[in-house]
Amino acid sequence: MTIKNSFLEYRMTELTQQIEKSTWHSKFAALGPGILMASAAVGGSHIIASTQSGAIYGWQLAIIIILANLFKYPFFRFGVQYTLDSGETLLQGYLRKGKLYIWIFFLLNVFATVINTAAVGLLCAAILTFVLPVQVPVPTLSFIVIGVSTSILLLGKYRLLDGLSKLIMIALTITTVSAVIIALARNGIQGVAPADYVSASPWNLAALGFIVALMGWMPAPIEISAINSMWVIAKRRVSKVSYQDGIWDFNVGYIGTAILALVFLALGALVQHGSSETVQLVGGKYIAQLINMYASTIGEWARGLIAFIAFMCMFGTTITVIDGYSRTNVESLRLILGKKESRPSYLNVAITFAALAGLAIIFYFNNAVGPMLKFAMIASFVSTPVFAYLNLSLVLKGEHRVKGKLLWLSLIGLMYLTSFTLLFIAQQAGWLN
């Protein structure tokens, strides 16, 4: 009994010390993985999906964005929570549940690596064509963007990635919020829409595909939870991060990106919704349209501001996509092969593969990027409930096991994600027609 009491007293003392060590200095020092997650999210869902939802439906889909971020919060948090608590990557946790899950994740992840690298590289290059004073072919610009991103990762490693992502997110947040404030001051909450304008309704089956695409990558695909887990491990190799500070970093990144999703919705709602111009749905054409709309509504000087916002979105996403997906590919393959550890050079090989494979798609299969990206989005959305459940199952035990309100939120979120997935499958199968 005495030994048991002594152990409990020791654990209480240890926990108290951990809490006391969590200072504002340690919190800011821990920032990194959460910011990287936010940087990966804004290019995938915000600059296109959020802004288009505002342009087409005004403020109506704000509730969907809020709910998607709210109900996905636990499952992204659990990836970080498991790693901080156990010292293992989320993929190691998947392996404990069964090797089949690692295989499924690996196959989906390799496909997503190639397609997402090509897609974000193309979009980033397309944005550059709007601001460069000379005409440069998009594939050439894609080569430059992906080449620069790869060089940063190969030469600077995690430390440079960590620091660069913070600068990108600070610049992106300031400029995006400034653009919305200027648009509000010029046009008011109604934006450019006439007073008697009747918005199209998103609450019908015809709009389900758009809503599913918005939700699927809002704030990011579910595999980002595994990627974020890898970034937590990388951060702990270069800096001491406590459990409390690691969760704080995650909350800053996740809540920040959720707020930015609404800010990007406002970009579309204030200058495009209700205008006479039909909203483009293709990524590159849509960003060109958005830039032109801001220039005509606010002033020609705003063209550079919106182009800068769009470029920072996509450049930050390009870097984090190549790094994050490469890390999870290396870790997945290590676990499949049963190796104890992987060499640092393996990550360099994976990064190079992601870059070259993405460029191959751009140069030789350019027309296939759209359909392949759509398939990647659908696969990500359909697999979300499975990996969300796995993430939850890994934090039901242990020192920081999930309980109370967070457990209830995760259960409601799991039902929410599963229901939408089944609804989407039913629509695609034609059962709702």
Swiss-Prot record:
Topology with respect to the bilayer: Multi-pass membrane protein
Keywords assigned by UniProt, alphabetized: Cell membrane, Membrane, Transmembrane, Transmembrane helix
Predominant localisation class: membrane
One GO location term (cellular component): plasma membrane
Entry's localization field: Cell membrane
Superkingdom field: Bacteria
Transmembrane stretches, start-end: 28-48, 56-76, 102-122, 126-146, 164-184, 207-227, 250-270, 304-324, 345-365, 375-395, 406-426
Name of the featured protein: Uncharacterized protein PM0681
Source species of the chain: Pasteurella multocida (strain Pm70)
